[in-house]
């Protein structure tokens, strides 16, 4: 079963990873593994944002079409 991802949880985890890496107290392999996890999370977050952006764009364009049709009827 695939894990369901949550934007806020992923963002919080990414912030934790960045904080840990910035401290610089890890061995190379640990740093690499955290960096890799951070990149994977970052890609997921970007994908989620693009999906939401697309949905918002669709909603806005649908709303504009409705408003335009209403204005046509009032003419």
Curated annotation (Swiss-Prot):
It is found in: Cytoplasm. The keyword Hydrolase applies. One of its GO terms (cellular component) is cytosol. Its EC number is 3.1.11.6. Pfam families: Exonuc_VII_S. It catalyses: Exonucleolytic cleavage in either 5'- to 3'- or 3'- to 5'-direction to yield nucleoside 5'-phosphates. One of its GO terms (biological process) is DNA catabolic process. Bidirectionally degrades single-stranded DNA into large acid-insoluble oligonucleotides, which are then degraded further into small acid-soluble oligonucleotides. Belongs to the XseB family. This is Exodeoxyribonuclease 7 small subunit. It comes from Caldanaerobacter subterraneus subsp. tengcongensis (strain DSM 15242 / JCM 11007 / NBRC 100824 / MB4). The lineage of its organism: Bacteria, Bacillati, Bacillota, Clostridia, Thermoanaerobacterales.
